[in-house]
Amino acid sequence: MPIAVPDYKAPSWCPGGHLQTVIPAKFMPRPAIEYRREKVELPDGDFMLWDWAVPEPADPLAPVLVHFHGLEGSSRSHYAEALMAACTERGWRGVVAHFRSCGGEMNRLPRAYFAGDSDDCEWVLRTCLLY
């Protein structure tokens, strides 16, 4: 699978990937998302923090979209807020699952988050099937 579009041309006013990353993060309007935080206990005795964006009125049968933030990201990252706004506009329930110690609260166990660990991701997805 190709990782780039070979005929992509950056706009003349925004050449290069760095500007294309910074401009949306710093200068684009951000939706006002009201999250409901949930502290979810993990099977190993630790916890994760989940920030839910749920439309009102909430439909318990609406799809759940799970978002895993990027490195040093959170539910307040511009891309997470945009995605959660798109979810609620469609009537879906969205959740940003913060990796261990990434939600503003240090975890109980010495196990830390790292990008290569998919066990927590799998557990989150399986657990969200119950919601």
Regions of interest found by a model, annotated:
Residues 76, 84-108:
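Conserved alpha/beta-hydrolase
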Residues 81:
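An amphipathic, basic-hydrophobic helix/alpha-beta surface used to engage anionic
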Residues 19-58:
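N-terminal cap/lid segment of alpha/beta-hydrolase-fold proteins
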Residues 61-70:
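Short beta-strand element of the alpha/beta-hydrolase
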Residues 72-74:
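Short strand->helix junction
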Residues 86, 102-131:
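Catalytic nucleophile-loop/oxyanion-hole region of alpha/beta-hydrolase
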Residues 1-28:
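N-terminal presequences and immediately downstream first alpha-helices
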Residues 59-60, 131:
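Glycine-rich phosphate-binding loop signature in dinucleotide/nucleotide-binding domains
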